[in-house]
């Protein structure tokens, strides 16, 4: 499944193309580029799901976790490093289908809904970045990689909520959402650092976690801090105050934020 890298690469390339060259494109061209990229991503996601769930199961009846890509990015010690890659397990494969489907529908709907809007190309660039961030989050091979894409989701939300940047209400809503979720994400980051320090790994693998020496009593604290990040993205009390104002963005962005940022990331 080496082609799975395209699931992340295509929306990223779409973001670069529209972000850097969008002002020289017509609205129709920009919309077609963004929608075509997501159409291919959706097809690849469904293909991945079909191949993954049709493969023979392990002896205990579970599906094998696959890692088509993985490389060391930041090595700290011989046993502790931050890797980057793609992890395919039942949850991540299922979420690839959900994210690509919802995002593709939003891309298609936006083609008509945003017709004639100023900043049409910029909108599709942000939408591509948002989609890439969510896809990268669910296929992360470790907690730290997940955090990087988690923050990209937050940045993308900020850009889309504040799309109508000439409206003071939209700017205020974008800032509010960004700042409130940053408080939650700070807990997430501290939890990741505590977890890595005491567990000696950032991996999701139960086997490597079981081999980690010492610090077992600190793991629940680390996981509790990580939960704060999820609480912020999910708009749980008392970190829910940003959600009503998030409707200042385009209508379909609010739909994508509610369906994806809150449900998927949270």
Where are these regions (language model features)?
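...captures the hydrophobic TM-helix bundle architecture rather than a specific catalytic motif
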Residues: 1-266
């Amino acid at each position: 499944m080496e082609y799975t890298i395209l699931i992340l690469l295509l929306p990223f390339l779409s973001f670069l193309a529209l972000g850097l060259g969008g002002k020289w494109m017509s609205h129709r061209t920009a919309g077609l580029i963004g929608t075509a990229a997501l159409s291919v991503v959706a097809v690849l996601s469904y293909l991945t799901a079909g191949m993954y769930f049709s493969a023979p199961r392990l002896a205990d009846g579970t599906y094998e976790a696959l890692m088509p890509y993985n490389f060391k990015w930041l090595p700290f010690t011989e046993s502790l490093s931050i890797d980057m890659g793609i992890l395919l397990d039942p949850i991540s494969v299922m979420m690839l289908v959900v994210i690509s489907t919802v995002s593709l529908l939003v891309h298609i709907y936006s083609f008509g809904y945003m017709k004639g809007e100023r900043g049409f190309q910029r909108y599709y660039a942000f939408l591509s970045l948002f989609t890439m961030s969510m896809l990268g989050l669910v296929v992360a091979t470790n907690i730290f990689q997940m955090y990087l894409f988690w923050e990209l989701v937050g940045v993308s939300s900020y850009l889309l909520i504040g799309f109508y940047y000439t409206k003071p209400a939209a700017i205020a809503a974008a800032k509010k959402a960004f700042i409130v979720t940053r408080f939650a994400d700070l807990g997430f980051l501290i939890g990741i650092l505590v977890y890595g320090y005491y567990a000696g790994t950032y991996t999701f693998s139960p086997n490597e976690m079981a081999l980690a020496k010492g610090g077992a009593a600190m793991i629940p604290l680390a996981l509790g801090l990580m939960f704060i990040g999820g609480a912020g993205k999910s708009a749980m009390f008392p970190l829910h105050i940003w959600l009503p104002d998030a409707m200042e963005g385009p209508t379909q962005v609010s739909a994508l934020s509610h369906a994806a940022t809150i449900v998927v990331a949270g």
